[in-house]
């Protein structure tokens, strides 16, 4: 994958989440700047999603732990646990919000 392709795909991933924040039943907010997306929860905790361009990865930090996702085929996969990004971000957001949160891939 070229650097250009990586940036397009990583930005699309974050944009997909941004587009869904207002429709989310949990009272979430977000801030986005320079390849970093912060999801802000009602208790002021955050999930931080950021691009790691040199590694062609997307890193996710929750209040519980951190994960590094890399593109395998057409899915972002955690390089330690093997979890798929959308499944992981739904579970992590639900856990952090204390209520059901569902994000959907745009693919």
UniProtKB/Swiss-Prot annotation:
Q: Which SUPFAM superfamilies match?
A: Frataxin/Nqo15-like (SSF55387)
Which UniProt key words apply to this protein? Answer: Iron, Metal-binding
Q: Gene name? A: cyaY
Which family is this protein grouped under? Belongs to the frataxin family.
Q: Which GO terms describe its molecular function?
A: ferric iron binding; ferrous iron binding
Q: Which Gene3D superfamilies match?
A: Frataxin/CyaY (3.30.920.10)
Q: Which organism is it from?
A: Pseudoalteromonas translucida (strain TAC 125)
The identity of this protein, by name, is: Iron-sulfur cluster assembly protein CyaY
Q: Which GO terms describe its biological process?
A: iron-sulfur cluster assembly
Q: Which SMART domains match?
A: Frataxin_Cyay (SM01219)
Q: What does this protein do?
A: Involved in iron-sulfur (Fe-S) cluster assembly. May act as a regulator of Fe-S biogenesis.
Any matching Pfam family: Frataxin_Cyay
Q: Which terms in the GO cellular component ontology are assigned?
A: cytosol
Q: Which PANTHER family match?
A: FRATAXIN, FRATAXIN, MITOCHONDRIAL
